[in-house]
Amino acid sequence: MNPQELKSILSHGLLSFPVTDFNAQGDFNPAGYIKRLEWLAPYGASALFAAGGTGEFFSLAASEYSQVIKTAVDTCATSVPILAGVGGSTRQAIEYAQEAERLGAKGLLLLPHYLTEASQDGVAAHVEAVCKSVNIGVVVYNRNVCRLNADLLEKLAERCPNLIGYKDGLGDIELMVSIRRRLGERFSYLGGLPTAEVYAAAYKALGVPVYSSAVFNFVPKTAMDFYSAIARDDHAAVAKLIDDFFLPYLDIRNRKAGYAVSIVKAGAKIAGYDAGPVRTPLTDLTAEEYEMLAALMDKMGPQ
């Protein structure tokens, strides 16, 4: 799949990022991961991101990363395209990127470089180096310390033909509008704020109709129903799902830092696809919070 073909796929439909399965000892559990991917693939996501932020990329050893990507690529070879999360320092990100390409990933999600604050030029040089290290398509994730502006994204688009997507995790509307207007159809644009459904209608109005869903991991039918309502501008259906599910969900998720990942793993367990515990420094939901989520999911009916 060439970068432009990937761009076309990412320009439509719902995207998601599977959690990574760990066993009771905290080691990667490929059997559980295969089962998860086989369950999720038929629901109709346009692409899946393996070892993304919700997939706990930040906690994976290099050898585990290879196992996760290979398992995802092999399992979904005939069902849904797999993009691999990559990140860390520039050299680390290049190593991950080249390994993901070798293993057959169709593209990359370039996660923010970890912790280090850097100038716009430095971040742009980081993105350019990763893009030029591979031939597959790359989506850059503007979030936290990675905050590229429209000027630099335009320059990167000229220098890196395989930079085909922009994912926004900042929620800066002025910046998002300036990037969307400046770059036009050069990129596919993805909404990437945590629990993106809450922002989906607003982002669609900005020209960003595609987003990645965390809750697809455990209520995939509900996630697809919500996306369909957004796509057809069914405001009543959107409002009902936000009131009935997403706002109560946020009340649980926002109780503690890091719960954006923890609550998804809890949901997967409730759904019958236990992915094991999160790795430190994240913490799992409390028993009370787990029961609150279970009751909320029950209201959504069979998936």
Curated annotation (Swiss-Prot):
Known EC number: 4.2.1.41
Pfam families: DHDPS (PF00701)
Enzyme class: lyase
Transmembrane is among the record's keywords: no
Highest taxon, organism lineage: Bacteria
UniProt signal peptide: none
UniProt keyword annotations, A-Z: Lyase
GO BP of this protein: D-glucarate catabolic process
Membership in a protein family: Belongs to the DapA family.
Name by which UniProt lists this protein: Probable 5-dehydro-4-deoxyglucarate dehydratase
